[in-house]
């Protein structure tokens, strides 16, 4: 009898395991619009538009307003923004930290690891001896005592301004040129064309790493950290209110190479971001299997076939 009972139990367990997994429930109607902030950097534009394409394929509507880092988390706190995928750490820790501490936002996942975010120089400047943060001060005259940053209020600029203010590395007499990502890149391009020395805020992933021959300076870990990662931040409670979108966001993890490819299409080939990221997804459909595991459309169907159809894949 015991043997028969065990055998029957085993058969029942086997039959249950063979049943298809129950699809997740669709999100409520209040989740149908997903508001994602685009910081305006090319990497931010790439990942935000890629995510928007996937969500649209699942039946969601999306808004991707351009938003400065300094107000992104405030917008999430007052529930005017749901998702922000460009929390660069550790450089932005002081910006997002207060909102994390008071529970206004939640760090959902790390969407990129192995990134760089620090000062860089052209390779010919490295060859001439500027290799480390401690070398910069000795090049003051050649550099016109200037470090090129990006837009005002950016976390990297704030770190550079603090470095100058505290005379770190003897840079108290330097100035930080604040403009924009494109403004900085234009300045770098002109300097390289003229073989002039320049120090600038650089990061990877970014097409600049393929377009320019540059070296990231050593010795700046106390300012920028040893390495960089990028996190997805959601407003407090969002992943619980909209668990299907939350599952997708937790599973969206990128590589440096993937972002470089999308960013190159956007910034150098001048392909509009929605189209560039859609083309990248069509060329790399294998990423969808993991990203969409257990995810459903707005009406509860498996998301993978719907997104593939949206992208024009067989």
Question: What are these regions, as identified by a protein language model?
Answer:
Residues 104-156:
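A conserved helix-loop-strand patch within extracytoplasmic ligand-binding domains
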